[in-house]
């Protein structure tokens, strides 16, 4: 909801949740939590585009926001809105879908977040 509220304020169309993108985001959040590393590169993947393709989604473009800390989703989305780079991903006009994933690190306190934004290839 918060992501679409940000987009609406700027005259952009809302995004629809997508199960494939949520799977890609959740897998990446788990990978980051397992390694205790915040990175757009995962084990065995070159980046978000490759991870999204592995789910079967056929992207035209893909963007990703990541974060880690003792925060809930509302705080993470607020921080992404305050960051010009993260906000730019949320505001890409062409994106149509999103998926969010989270994983808790072994310390039981640090939450790793990944949000994937994408648009499918045109047929």
Task: Report the location of each language-model feature.
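Loop/turn elements at helix/coil->beta-strand transitions in domains of secreted/extracellular proteins
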Residues: 8-10, 57, 62, 96-98, ...
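Disulfide-stabilized extracellular recognition modules
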Residues: 68-123
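Divalent metal-coordination and catalytic microenvironments
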Residues: 7, 25, 100
């Amino acid at each position: 909801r918060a992501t679409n509220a940000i987009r609406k304020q700027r005259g952009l169309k809302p995004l629809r949740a997508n199960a494939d993108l949520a799977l890609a985001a959740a897998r990446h959040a788990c990978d980051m939590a397992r390694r205790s590393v915040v990175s757009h590169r995962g084990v065995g993947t070159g980046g978000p585009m490759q991870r999204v393709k592995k789910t079967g989604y056929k992207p035209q473009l893909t963007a990703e926001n990541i974060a880690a800390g003792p925060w809930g989703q509302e705080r993470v989305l607020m921080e992404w809105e305050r960051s010009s780079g993260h906000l730019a991903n949320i505001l890409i006009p062409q994106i149509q879908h999103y998926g969010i994933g989270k994983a808790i690190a072994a310390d039981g306190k640090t939450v790793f977040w990944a949000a994937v934004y994408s648009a499918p290839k045109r047929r």
